[in-house]
């Protein structure tokens, strides 16, 4: 499979040959959905906790006597039906993580990259970066490439590139080990360097 290579001015400057094994897969919507849901589930803190009637402070004394008042009987002011009472089915901290096999995870990323390549949303460049942490310089580069709010995948994210991209809305910068399915699915376009492309190819082939 061939992908167009762009220069710094955004013009086509030859092409890059990539393996079909990494970028020629069919679109597997169900697999991508499963992996994205599992990834987001794993990102949940799972720390929420509520108190049952036994755990809420107070409520030890019977509010009024059992008989003779005309009111409904009550044994504690911390009953779940009372304001300020405990929860009937209190939430507990839990792990929301879902198991995803390595083959499934790689298969989902392969499918996403293949679809990006098919839709010409994968922009391959020789290199991307700035010599000083200036947002305007990076914005000018992206404008020349004709991309807006892209995910930038570099073989190495230096401090200047990170700082320059930080103030651009919708722009995200990652290296290859830092890629995840949510970032890829959410990206309008992906700008990737040749070196990073080779790393992805080796990883997913």
UniProtKB/Swiss-Prot annotation:
<protein>
    <recommendedName>
        <fullName>Large ribosomal subunit protein uL4</fullName>
    </recommendedName>
</protein>
<keyword id="KW-0689">Ribosomal protein</keyword>
<dbReference type="GO" id="GO:0019843">
    <property type="term" value="F:rRNA binding"/>
</dbReference>
<comment type="function">
    <text>Forms part of the polypeptide exit tunnel.</text>
</comment>
<dbReference type="InterPro" id="IPR023574">
    <property type="entry name" value="Ribosomal_uL4_dom_sf"/>
</dbReference>
<keyword id="KW-0687">Ribonucleoprotein</keyword>
<keyword id="KW-0694">RNA-binding</keyword>
<keyword id="KW-0699">rRNA-binding</keyword>
<dbReference type="GO" id="GO:1990904">
    <property type="term" value="C:ribonucleoprotein complex"/>
</dbReference>
<dbReference type="InterPro" id="IPR002136">
    <property type="entry name" value="Ribosomal_uL4"/>
</dbReference>
<dbReference type="GO" id="GO:0005840">
    <property type="term" value="C:ribosome"/>
</dbReference>
<comment type="subunit">
    <text>Part of the 50S ribosomal subunit.</text>
</comment>
<dbReference type="GO" id="GO:0003735">
    <property type="term" value="F:structural constituent of ribosome"/>
</dbReference>
<dbReference type="InterPro" id="IPR013005">
    <property type="entry name" value="Ribosomal_uL4-like"/>
</dbReference>
<dbReference type="Pfam" id="PF00573">
    <property type="entry name" value="Ribosomal_L4"/>
</dbReference>
<comment type="similarity">
    <text>Belongs to the universal ribosomal protein uL4 family.</text>
</comment>
<feature type="region of interest" description="Disordered">
    <location>
        <begin position="51"/>
        <end position="70"/>
    </location>
</feature>
<dbReference type="GO" id="GO:0006412">
    <property type="term" value="P:translation"/>
</dbReference>
<comment type="function">
    <text>One of the primary rRNA binding proteins, this protein initially binds near the 5'-end of the 23S rRNA. It is important during the early stages of 50S assembly. It makes multiple contacts with different domains of the 23S rRNA in the assembled 50S subunit and ribosome.</text>
</comment>
């Amino acid at each position: 499979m061939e992908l167009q290579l762009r220069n710094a001015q955004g013009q086509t400057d030859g092409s890059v040959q990539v393996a079909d094994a990494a970028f020629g897969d069919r679109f597997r919507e169900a697999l991508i959905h499963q992996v994205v849901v599992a990834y987001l589930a794993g990102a949940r803190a799972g720390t929420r906790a509520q108190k049952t009637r036994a755990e809420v402070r107070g409520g030890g004394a019977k509010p009024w006597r059992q008989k003779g008042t005309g009111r409904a009987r009550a044994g504690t002011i911390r009953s779940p039906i009372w304001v300020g009472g405990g929860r009937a089915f209190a939430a507990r901290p839990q792990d929301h993580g879902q198991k995803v096999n390595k083959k499934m995870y790689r298969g989902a990323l392969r499918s996403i990259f293949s679809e990006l390549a098919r839709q010409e949303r994968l922009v391959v460049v020789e290199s991307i970066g700035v010599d000083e942490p200036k947002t305007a310089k990076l914005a000018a580069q992206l404008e020349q490439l004709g991309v807006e709010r892209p995910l930038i995948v570099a073989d190495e994210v230096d401090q200047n590139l990170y700082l320059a991209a930080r103030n651009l809305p919708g722009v995200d910068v990652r290296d290859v080990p830092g890629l995840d399915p949510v970032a890829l699915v959410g990206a309008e376009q992906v700008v990737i360097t040749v070196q990073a492309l080779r790393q992805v190819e080796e990883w997913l082939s």
